[in-house]
Each structure stands twice: as structure tokens, then as C-alpha cells.
């Protein structure tokens, strides 16, 4: 039943913030996983924090969520370039739930630095970010995507949207990032939609994924 599934989910979340599973220096935060046993937690990851926030974790425990977001702004684990987008998205998703403007102002310099890092990996010539790794498994290169994995492109597009909203909220120039987000959205629609397959493939036109009609 739905109630049973909810209780299982809450039990998993309780372990994810449990001190028994936390790594040193990461107590009171959302860990990416507790499956390795007591004292052997998986740690606080940028990508996994983003995924939890996109699924509403901020409503469950706002204090733990804030602590986690502030942590990944300065630290946090990641394997690939998607970790940059994940941090910016996490900040905005937390704000949407909390309206905690104090966090934005307190960490404004660090947030702007993360936004700048996102822009630094953006290729203005093709309107995409070089992303050899898909976000669903960013420990292994997605060779079929031809260096431009769809999921990571989508996260960067949304990260630029979040950057626009964050900067606007704290009174900083923001319009530039709205333009970047729109440019990425256009390129994703143009390059990844495979009309024969009727899907967005995990790589753009010209990649193995596009040719073989592979969906991530």
C-alpha cells in the first residue's frame, strides 16, 4: 500500500541522516546511502543531494537539508562535471521549500563562484556542456553519448535557470543566465530529438546513441 511504501521510505531517510552511518565531519546531513553498514556510510554527494531535493527532501527535515546544502557548497563528493550543476540546483530547490534568503545572502560569494564554474564548462559554439558522463552513473563514461550525455545537459540547463532565479533573488545581474538556459533548451530539442525513434536519445545527432536510438 501507499502507507507501507511511505513508511519504508521514511525509514531509509532516517538512516540517511543517522549519525551511525555518517562519515567524519558529515554528521547531521543527508548521506547518499547507508548500505555499507554502521560507520561505513557513503558520504554526502553533490548529485545525490540534488536528487533528494528535487524529490522534496526539504519538507522532511529543513535543518538537516540546510546543513547539507551549505556543506556541498564548500565540499561534497562528485565524480564528474554534473556536480557543478547539482550544487546550484540544490541551492534553489532548497530555497523554493524554505524561502531561506539568509542562506543565499550568507553564501552569496560561494554560490556565484559555483555559477561561474558552470558557465566555464559551457561551450558557446555548440550551446552545450562537454559531458562524457551521464548523471545516472557518473562514475563511468557514457561512450555512446559522444561526450554530450543528455541527462547532464538537462541538469546544466536547469542550473542556469536556477542561477537566474538565485541572482535575481539577491539583487545581482541575472538575465545572462536566463539566456544561457534558453539556448541550451533549444539545442537539446534540436540535437537530441530522434524523430524516427520518437524519443530524446542519450546522445546528440551524430552520436552512437542517436544512431542506435538509445535512451539513457
Predicted regions and their residues:
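Extended, well-ordered alpha-helical scaffold segments
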Residues: 4-9, 61-74, 101-119, 163, ...
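The feature captures the catalytic groove of carbohydrate-active enzymes
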Residues: 77-82, 116-182, 186, 193-216
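Generic detector of bulky aromatic hydrophobic side chains
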Residues: 10, 14, 50, 114, ...
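Substrate-binding groove/exosite segments of carbohydrate-active enzymes
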Residues: 1-105, 201, 206, 210-216
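Conserved helix-loop functional segments at active or binding sites
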Residues: 15-19, 61, 93-96, 120, ...
Amino acid at each position: 500500500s501507499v502507507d507501507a511504501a511511505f513508511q519504508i521510505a521514511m525509514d531509509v531517510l532516517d538512516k540517511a541522516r543517522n549519525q551511525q552511518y555518517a562519515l567524519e565531519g558529515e554528521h547531521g546531513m543527508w548521506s547518499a546511502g547507508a548500505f555499507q553498514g554502521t560507520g561505513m556510510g557513503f558520504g554526502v554527494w553533490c548529485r545525490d543531494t540534488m536528487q533528494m531535493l528535487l524529490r522534496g527532501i526539504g519538507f522532511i527535515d529543513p535543518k538537516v537539508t540546510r546543513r547539507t546544502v551549505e556543506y556541498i557548497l564548500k565540499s561534497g563528493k562528485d565524480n564528474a562535471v554534473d556536480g557543478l550543476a547539482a550544487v546550484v540546483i540544490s541551492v534553489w530547490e532548497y530555497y523554493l521549500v524554505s524561502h531561506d534568503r539568509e542562506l543565499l545572502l550568507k553564501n552569496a560569494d560561494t554560490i556565484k563562484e559555483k555559477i561561474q564554474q558552470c558557465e566555464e564548462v559551457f561551450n558557446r559554439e555548440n550551446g552545450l556542456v562537454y559531458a562524457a558522463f551521464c548523471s545516472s552513473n557518473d562514475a563511468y563514461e557514457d561512450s555512446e553519448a559522444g561526450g554530450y550525455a543528455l541527462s547532464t545537459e538537462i541538469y546544466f540547463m536547469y542550473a542556469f535557470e536556477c542561477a537566474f532565479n538565485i541572482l535575481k533573488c539577491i539583487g545581482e545581474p541575472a538575465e545572462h543566465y536566463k539566456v544561457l538556459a534558453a539556448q541550451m533548451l533549444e539545442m537539446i530539442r534540436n540535437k537530441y530529438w530522434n524523430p524516427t525513434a520518437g524519443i530524446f536519445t542519450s546522445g546528440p545527432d551524430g552520436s552512437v546513441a542517436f544512431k542506435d536510438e538509445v535512451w539513457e
